[in-house]
């Protein structure tokens, strides 16, 4: 794959269109149903040429146009991006994708971390069951999930771990949890290291686990890609939408305000052009 676009808002689809017009293989990756605040907007009046259109309809028009040009789409949350020579590996739930360039278009939403989560990441806390599940074979683990996608992750971990407890970070259907996975009706508050294990403190008590897996619909920028420079919670870019790492670009609300559809579309276009130029130099 030439370009992997993370995010399916206006910036992402705009980037995909321009990339395909440049003849580059392109995939747009985002969790199913995610379209940011725009998907819930009842009426948009300030997008040129399309007055009084709903946000959902506008997004679908962007999507259909990009797909018609040959862009691919994948429903998954990208949990981590790692440089791999002149390529990038994107860990996307139960899959690993490779691309020559990455364009980040995830919007402005940022997850709120549990106290202690960042400190324990990679040391008992993980965002990827496929990547790290093997380290917890025969051990006790917990799954903390903000959506029903965590049910599938819990099922995978159950095939490895001795026991799996499931905590819903936000209300969602847990009726399809497999046998052997216990739903715990407690609210996680914080994480800490205790007795050589991960202590999960809830609104009721403290539970000790060998590992804790956390699944949300977004990943903190500083944990998504090591070395990515930010400014006030936004990705720092230059006028060509180049981020601080070679081969990485960003567009849309993720680069900061003003949070406008037209800005996102324009930045997506610029990012695709810059990414195409970067790939051409790779030879």
Report the location of each language-model feature.
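Glycine/small-residue-rich loop that forms an oxyanion/phosphate-binding "nest" at active or ligand-binding sites
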Residues: 73-138
């Amino acid at each position: 794959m030439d370009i992997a676009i993370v995010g399916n808002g206006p910036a992402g689809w705009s980037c995909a269109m321009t990339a395909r017009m440049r003849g580059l293989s392109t995939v747009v990756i985002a969790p199913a149903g995610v379209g940011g605040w725009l998907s819930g907007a009842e009426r948009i009046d300030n997008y040129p040429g399309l007055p009084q259109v709903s946000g959902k309809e506008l997004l679908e028009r962007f999507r259909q146009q990009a797909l018609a040009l040959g862009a691919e789409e994948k429903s998954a949350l990208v949990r981590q991006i790692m440089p791999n020579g002149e390529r990038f590996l994107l860990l996307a739930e139960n899959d690993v994708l490779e691309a020559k360039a990455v364009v980040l278009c995830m919007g402005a939403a940022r997850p709120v971390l549990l106290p202690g989560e960042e400190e324990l990441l990679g040391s008992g806390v993980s965002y990827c069951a496929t990547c790290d599940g093997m380290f917890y074979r025969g051990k006790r683990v917990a799954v903390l999930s903000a959506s029903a996608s965590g049910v599938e992750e819990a099922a995978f971990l159950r095939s490895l771990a001795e026991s799996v407890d499931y905590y819903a970070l936000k209300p969602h259907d847990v009726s399809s949890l497999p046998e052997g996975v216990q739903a715990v009706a407690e609210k996680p508050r914080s994480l800490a290291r205790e007795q050589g294990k991960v202590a999960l403190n809830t609104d009721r008590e403290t539970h000790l686990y060998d590992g804790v897996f956390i699944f949300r619909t977004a990943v903190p920028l500083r944990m998504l890609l090591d070395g990515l420079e930010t400014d006030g919670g936004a990705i720092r870019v230059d006028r060509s939408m180049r981020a601080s790492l070679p081969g990485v670009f960003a567009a849309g609300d993720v680069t900061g305000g003003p949070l406008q559809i037209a800005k996102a579309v324009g930045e997506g276009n610029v990012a695709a052009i810059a990414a195409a130029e970067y790939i051409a130099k790779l030879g």
